[in-house]
UniProtKB/Swiss-Prot annotation:
Signal peptide: none annotated. It comes from the Eukaryota. GO terms for molecular function: metal ion binding. Keywords: Apoplast, Manganese, Metal-binding, Secreted. It is found in: Secreted, Extracellular space, Apoplast. One of its GO terms (cellular component) is apoplast. It comes from Betula pendula (European white birch). May play a role in plant defense. Probably has no oxalate oxidase activity even if the active site is conserved. Belongs to the germin family. This is Germin-like protein 1.
Amino acid sequence: ILGLNTLGVSLAR
């Protein structure tokens, strides 16, 4: 899922 991936990256940042 692209949305989940983006959320993960944002959280990691």
